[in-house]
Amino acid sequence: LGFLERKRGMRPPLEPRALPSTVLAPDGSVRYFAYGSNLGRQKVLSRGAASIISTERANVAGWRLAFTFALNPPLEPSFASIEPAPAETVCEGVLHTLTPSAYEELWRSEGGGGSRPDYEEIVVLAKPWSGSEPVRAITLRAAQIRRLSHDVPPSQRYLSIVVAGAHEAGLSPAYIARLEAISAAAPSGFLAAVAEAHGLLLVLLYLLGLQRLLSPLRAICFLLHRHVRPRLRDIATGLLPPPPPRAAPS
């Protein structure tokens, strides 16, 4: 991870892009709706944002928190995304108001800036808890190349970050309880060791610009996750029968 942080520090600053005018405040700052690991202010700052102008809790109706961002099973099977849902469904989160340059740093830290971003930017209608009028905000949804057709349990490490951010933000007790009830991936010690070795290889390939060489292996892992034969599914999730996944909060 230190290698990656140093590599991030060597990157040239990004020029702010032209964003939809509806997500810009009168002073030109960007309204960004966070629902997953970016709920916590410190997490956003750690992504390169110099500062956060303001933060307030908000709801987005018609969308749900989903763990459909395909990553690297079995240690990190998925990250959070946001997916369409029935109109009565509410995704709780926070509105971070950022300078354009701070938002660009966050966007790049989430895989933006390249020819095939990991997330796509979408505009949602966020209703602040303060009672003020709903506002348009930009948020991130897993790009089609990363998007799974169903939720996959995230790692306990990642889920803990989301839950901690929800507590920090002061989201509703009922919503936090549903987050805490989500089953996390639990690979066996053997498979975890194999995956850690794979992770070190992935970091090395990333530094060399060759990370796409492992794409076929990642695809096989997700095929095993979805396989109807219990034996193959168990291999993919840690050689042990995985707990039945619980749905993300709606």
Pin down the residues of each PLM region.
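Glycine-aromatic micro-motifs
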Residues: G2-S250
